[in-house]
Amino acid sequence: QVPPMKTLNDRMGMKIVDSRLTIKNYSSLDKYNGTPLLGAYTIDAEGVVPPKEVTLVENGIFKAMLNGNIPAVKAPESTGSLRFSLSSRNGAFNLAPGTIHIKADKGTKPEKMKSALIKAAKEEGLKYAYIVRSLAGKASRIYRVDLKDGSETQVRFGDVTGFTLPNLKRMLGISSKENVSNFIFNGEVLSSMIYPSSILVENIEINKSDVKKDKEQVLTFPLQK
């Protein structure tokens, strides 16, 4: 009998991402390195003043989760994270972050990420590696990197699949440079994210219309448009 798969809630206190990563949620932080953060707020939909900072993941270990006033087994207290929906006219609200900060310890200089990609691919005996500059299904911007000279060729109609949380438990490289993005969480709540500009991972599937699946080293630029 196959044991049931663990949900994220079941992984409290366990390693879920690379040990170099710490993830925090900020509520009232309204600017980061000169960029306005649209996820900033001072009180949630239940009238709870959220803590300015909640550490969700520390050195890769799942420490806490966001919650409202209704206690949960893994989150007995509110983090002031029930927020009003942008589209609602009747006061509906959703559990949502303010600003998520994914911070890397001892990150790699951004100009060295590509050389790290090429080195890792050569060690695996591969002919090519791939750089993903945006994730958008079949419209993803994917570039094949020639390991001999580092030249890049755009892959047409590429689709990245198989990128899941386990891929983040052991990353080959994390950029020290950070990007800042504002977005609408689940199409309902203004949120922001601060995150490494690129990460180096392996065993990601690249689907193309004219070739079979390739499992190669991949350098991704998360959330970059």
Predicted region positions:
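Dual-mode signal for accessory low-complexity, basic/Gly-rich regions
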Residues: 4-225
